[in-house]
Amino acid sequence: MTSSLVGSEMCIRARCRIGRCDTAIAADINPLPLERGIETINNSGLNNRIEARLSNGLEKISGDEADDIVIAGMGGELISQIIENWEFSKDRSKHFILQPMTKSEELMRWLFANGFSVIKRDCCTAANKCYTVILAEYSGEVRTVSESDLFLYGLDPKNNSMHRRFIEGCVRRLLKQAKGNPVCAETARILEESFK
């Protein structure tokens, strides 16, 4: 199995080390981060299993080169653009592991509106910040979900402390936006109710 990664090469190294993929392609649009990634790959002894490419998103990765696509370390809107621009994104054999740093709700909105199913969702921390991780694949089923479900879908903030931490961060952000937007205020209220 081959994985392709756009963003940070850390996840791809971990997947190779634990045997989740035989080979991988790490891609970045900027030469300097790609060079640092190559150095890290070489230092970890995985240069025979991980290829690094200068690529705008998934542009330089063909459909037969990867089954699992990891896109991490950027905003949800950019992640959705990368998926939308890849000609193989609607191949039902592809799995997208997505870790948006910001605007995860916009990524969720895009996924549902464009026929992707969210198979699993969880949360993780990095640098003392909490983020969501989404496993999605193309199903062809377009869904409309409520504004609050864009934040809550697949999470259980009442029983999972990491999920709660993520939702609490979303509530804080929504309350900052609520002064000029009543939808944000109502969504924040619903999210707060989810962990009471």
Model-based region annotation:
Residues 1-12:
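Single conserved hydrophobic/aromatic residue that forms the stacking wall/gate
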Residues 12-21:
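Conserved SAM-binding loop of SAM-dependent methyltransferases across substrates and taxa
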Residues 15, 37, 50, 79-83, ...:
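Hydrophobic packing residues within well-ordered alpha-helices of enzyme cores
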Residues 19-20, 42-47, 89-91:
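Short helix-capping segments at alpha-helix termini
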Residues 22-23, 49, 95:
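Residues at the starts of beta-strands that form the adenosine-phosphate
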Residues 27, 31-66:
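S-adenosyl-L-methionine
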Residues 59-60, 65, 77-196:
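Class I S-adenosyl-L-methionine
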Residues 66-73:
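Short SAM/SAH-binding signature in class I
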